[in-house]
């Protein structure tokens, strides 16, 4: 199971060997053996994703790591320095300030696209650019809630236990938990 609590990221990796064996791209360690990472890849090639695993995003499908779309895990990798505080909690009734992302499915029969995460920003990705923006699957309501949370002080750019009382959930994680 994914651990709940407060953590600080100790290290990140371009590619990380996972159980299987398989590989996760843009992995960031949360604690112990738990990582934020992409859906597993068969090899360290961006067009070699385990496409049958991709369609399991949003379900518990691993040993407790948190699987994310490439656009989301790359954002963490690019924007969260080592030592970033991470809060993992569990409350499916409250999707948090960004809401629960929509689900993207790949067609296992489509050999031209199935090896890619649709949100990977790599220019060789055959998917439509709308998926690569990282925002195509966020709802307008989620963005409105995010803006409201910033405006009314529920989110001020820093996370601490006081900020989270009565507000936080891990459903932002739950939707991509795996």
Placement of each model-derived feature along the sequence:
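Exported/periplasmic cell-wall-interacting domains
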Residues: 6, 13-178
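Electropositive
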Residues: 1-8
